[in-house]
C-alpha cells in the first residue's frame, strides 16, 4: 500500500470514528473524546450555600511561596443573609450581595444567548456557582462571610459616566469599606478598599481577591473543546493556565510572589480577572474548596495598622468578552486569555489582518472571504506547483498502471521501476502533497482564530447565516462544500487502485457530514478556499493542456 493510500485510509477512518462519536452524543451517550457539559452538570452540582460562601482563605505560608493556598479554616455552618444590590449600566447588570459584599451575578447586556437573553457570567444558584469575592484575613476580620451595609445612592447610570456602590462592615475593631465603581461602556469595575483599625491594638490584615467557580463547562462542544479554568499571569512567568483536574490532584502550581500580574477564570469567549494594584507585593493561590468548587486568588499584605490608622488600596475586576484590543488596554498580558491554541504565532497576525478587513468591509463574513482570497494569493506558487505535479502524475497513470500489472507479483521490482519512471520524467510523487502539508498550519491557526474570536459570536453574514460562530442552520454551506470537494476529485488524477478511487469519491460526503457541526464561519472559509482551488486547478490544467498541444504541433 503506497503512502497516499495510507494517508487516505487514516483520514477516512478518523472521519468515521468522529461521526460515530457525534452520533453517540446525539443519542445521549458519553463522548469518547470530549467532556459532556450535561454530564458534568449532573454529576457536579453547584456547591452548597455554606461551602460556596463560607470558605475563607488562609494567608499563604510565606510571602513569595509558590503553590496552592493552605486549607481554609473551619467556618460556621450558618450562612449569612443580606440584601441584593442590583446595578445597571449600558454594558452590565450586576448583583452585589451584601452578605460578603460579593458580586454574585453579572449579566453582559451586549452579549446574547440564542434565546435573546443576556449572557450570564457570574451566577450563584443550584446549577452554577461563579462569583467574585474579596475580604481581609489575618484574624477574625471582615471577609466574604461578613454582612456589609450598602450606602444609599443611584443604582443605574441614567446618563452619568459612573456610579459607586459603597459597602461597609466592621468586625473585631477593624472596619472595611469596599467601594465598587462602575463606568459607562466598561467591563472593568474599579474596586477601592479602605481599612481602618478602630481597635486598641495593632493589626496586620491581608487583602484577598478571588474568583470562585464550579468545574463544569458552560457549553457543550461538538468537534472541538476549549479551555475552561483558572489562569495566572506575571511579567516573569507569563501566562499560566491551570486545569481543574490538576488542582483536584494537588498538582497545580502558581507563580512566585510579584508586584504585578493578575488572576483569571477563563471560558469560551468570556473571562473574568482580578487585577491588583501594580507595585504592591502580592502572592497567588489556587485551591479546591469542595469536590465541585474551585478558586484562584491573590493576596496583598497591607502592613501593620496602628490603632486609629487607615490604609487604602485598590484593584480592578474585569468580567466580559475576550475582545483582544480591549483586553490589551486593561492589563499587560490579559489578551492571552483568548486561546489560539499552539499556533498563536500564526493566529495573532491572521486575526489582525481579519480585523483590518472587517474595518474596511464592515461584515465578518465578507472579511473571512477576503482573508481566504489573500491567503490563496500568498500560497499561489505552492498550489500551482502542487497542481502541476498532480497533472504530470495524471499523464503518467497509463505507464504506472502498466508497471503495476507487469510486476504485480514482484513488489520490489515494481518499486524500482516506479522510482526509475519518476526519475526519468523528473516527477516527485509527493510533489502534490508537500505544498498542501505546508499550508496545514495556516489552516489550523485560522481555525482557532474563527473558533476563539468572540467577535464572530452573533455576527451575521447574509441571508440565512445569522451567526458565524454556530453551525449553518440549513446545512447549505456544508452541502456546497461537499459539491466543491467532489468537483476537485474529478480534476485530480484518478487513483489506479479501485479502493482508493472509491475512498476519494466518499470523502466529500464524509467531510460534508463532519462540517455540519462546525461553525459557519469556518465552513465558509473552507467553501471559498475550495472554489478558489477549483478555479486555480482548472486554469493550471488548461495551461498544461496548451503546453502539450504546442509540443505536439512542433513535433
UniProtKB/Swiss-Prot annotation:
Gene3D superfamilies in UniProt:
2.70.98.90
Q: Which GO terms describe its cellular component?
A: plasma membrane
As for subcellular location, the record says: Cell inner membrane
Gene Ontology biological process terms, A to Z = protein insertion into membrane; protein transport
A Pfam family recorded for this sequence: YidC_periplas
Q: Which InterPro entries match?
A: Membr_insert_YidC, Membr_insert_YidC_N, YidC/ALB3/OXA1/COX18, YidC/Oxa/ALB_C, YidC_ALB_C, YidC_periplasmic_sf
Q: How does it sit in the membrane?
A: Multi-pass membrane protein
Indicate the transmembrane segments per the record.
7-24, 334-354, 360-380, 430-450, 468-488, 503-523
The molecular function GO annotations come to: membrane insertase activity
Q: Which UniProt keywords apply?
A: Cell inner membrane, Cell membrane, Chaperone, Membrane, Protein transport, Transmembrane, Transmembrane helix, Transport
Give me the ranges of the annotated region Disordered. 62-81
NCBIfam families per the UniProt record, alphabetical: PRK01318.1-3 (NF002352), yidC_nterm (TIGR03593), yidC_oxa1_cterm (TIGR03592)
The family this protein is said to belong to: Belongs to the OXA1/ALB3/YidC family. Type 1 subfamily.
Q: What does this protein do?
A: Required for the insertion and/or proper folding and/or complex formation of integral membrane proteins into the membrane. Involved in integration of membrane proteins that insert both dependently and independently of the Sec translocase complex, as well as at least some lipoproteins. Aids folding of multispanning membrane proteins.
> Subunit info?
Interacts with the Sec translocase complex via SecD. Specifically interacts with transmembrane segments of nascent integral membrane proteins during membrane integration.
Instruction: Tell me the protein's name.
Output: Membrane protein insertase YidC
Native organism = Cupriavidus necator (strain ATCC 17699 / DSM 428 / KCTC 22496 / NCIMB 10442 / H16 / Stanier 337)
The encoding gene is yidC
Amino acid at each position: 500500500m503506497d503512502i497516499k493510500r495510507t494517508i487516505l485510509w487514516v483520514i477516512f477512518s478518523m472521519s468515521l470514528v468522529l461521526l460515530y462519536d457525534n452520533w453517540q452524543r446525539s443519542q445521549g451517550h458519553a463522548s469518547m473524546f470530549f467532556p459532556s457539559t450535561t454530564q458534568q452538570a449532573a454529576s457536579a452540582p453547584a456547591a452548597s450555600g455554606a461551602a460556596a460562601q463560607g470558605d475563607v482563605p488562609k494567608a499563604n505560608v510565606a510571602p513569595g511561596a509558590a503553590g496552592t493556598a493552605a486549607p481554609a479554616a473551619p467556618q460556621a455552618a450558618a450562612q449569612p443573609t443580606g440584601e441584593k444590590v442590583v446595578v445597571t449600566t449600558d454594558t452590565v447588570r450586576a448583583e452585589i450581595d451584601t452578605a460578603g459584599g460579593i458580586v454574585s451575578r453579572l449579566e453582559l447586556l451586549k452579549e446574547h444567548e440564542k434565546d435573546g437573553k443576556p449572557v450570564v457570567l457570574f451566577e450563584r444558584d443550584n446549577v452554577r456557582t461563579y462569583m467574585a469575592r474579596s475580604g481581609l484575613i489575618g484574624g477574625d476580620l471582615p471577609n466574604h462571610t461578613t454582612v456589609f451595609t450598602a450606602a444609599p445612592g443611584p443604582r443605574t447610570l441614567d446618563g452619568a459616566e459612573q456610579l459607586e456602590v459603597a459597602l461597609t462592615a466592621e468586625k473585631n475593631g477593624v472596619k472595611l469599606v469596599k467601594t465598587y465603581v462602575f463606568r459607562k461602556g466598561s467591563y472593568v469595575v474599579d474596586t477601592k478598599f479602605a481599612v481602618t483599625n478602630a481597635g486598641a491594638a495593632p493589626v496586620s490584615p491581608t487583602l484577598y481577591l478571588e474568583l470562585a467557580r464550579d468545574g463544569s463547562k458552560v457549553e457543550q462542544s461538538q468537534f472541538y473543546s476549549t479551555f475552561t479554568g483558572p489562569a495566572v499571569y506575571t511579567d516573569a512567568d507569563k501566562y499560566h493556565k491551570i486545569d481543574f483536574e490538576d488542582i483536584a490532584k494537588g498538582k497545580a502550581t502558581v507563580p512566585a510572589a510579584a508586584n504585578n500580574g493578575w488572576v483569571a477564570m477563563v471560558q469560551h469567549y468570556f473571562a473574568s480577572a482580578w487585577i491588583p494594584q501594580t507595585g504592591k507585593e502580592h502572592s497567588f493561590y489556587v485551591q479546591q474548596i469542595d469536590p465541585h468548587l474551585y478558586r484562584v486568588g491573590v493576596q496583598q499584605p497591607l502592613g501593620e495598622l496602628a490603632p486609629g490608622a487607615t490604609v487604602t488600596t485598590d484593584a480592578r475586576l474585569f468580567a466580559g468578552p475576550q475582545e483582544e484590543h480591549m483586553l490589551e488596554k486593561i492589563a499587560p498580558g490579559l489578551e492571552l486569555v483568548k486561546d489560539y491554541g499552539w499556533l498563536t504565532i500564526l493566529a495573532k497576525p491572521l486575526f489582525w489582518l481579519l480585523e483590518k478587513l472587517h474595518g474596511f468591509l464592515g461584515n465578518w463574513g465578507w472579511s473571512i472571504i477576503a482573508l481566504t482570497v489573500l491567503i490563496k494569493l500568498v500560497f499561489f506558487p505552492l498550489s500551482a506547483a502542487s497542481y502541476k505535479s498532480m497533472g504530470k502524475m495524471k499523464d503518467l497513470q497509463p505507464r504506472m498502471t502498466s508497471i503495476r500489472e507487469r510486476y504485480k507479483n514482484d513488489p520490489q521490482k515494481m518499486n524500482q521501476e516506479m522510482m526509475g519512471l519518476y526519475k526519468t520524467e523528473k516527477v516527485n510523487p509527493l510533489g502534490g502533497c508537500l505544498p498542501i502539508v505546508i499550508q496545514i498550519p495556516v489552516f489550523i491557526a485560522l481555525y482557532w482564530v474563527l473558533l476563539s474570536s468572540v467577535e464572530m459570536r452573533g455576527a451575521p453574514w447574509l441571508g440565512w447565516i445569522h451567526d458565524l460562530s454556530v453551525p449553518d442552520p440549513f446545512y447549505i454551506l456544508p452541502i456546497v462544500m461537499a459539491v466543491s470537494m467532489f468537483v476537485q476529485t474529478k480534476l485530480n488524477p484518478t487513483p489506479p487502485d479501485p479502493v482508493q478511487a472509491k475512498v476519494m469519491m466518499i470523502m466529500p460526503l464524509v467531510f460534508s457530514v463532519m462540517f455540519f457541526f462546525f461553525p459557519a464561519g469556518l465552513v465558509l472559509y473552507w467553501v471559498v478556499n475550495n472554489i478558489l482551488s477549483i478555479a486555480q486547478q482548472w486554469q493550471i490544467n488548461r495551461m498544461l493542456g496548451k503546453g502539450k498541444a504546442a509540443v505536439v504541433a512542433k513535433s
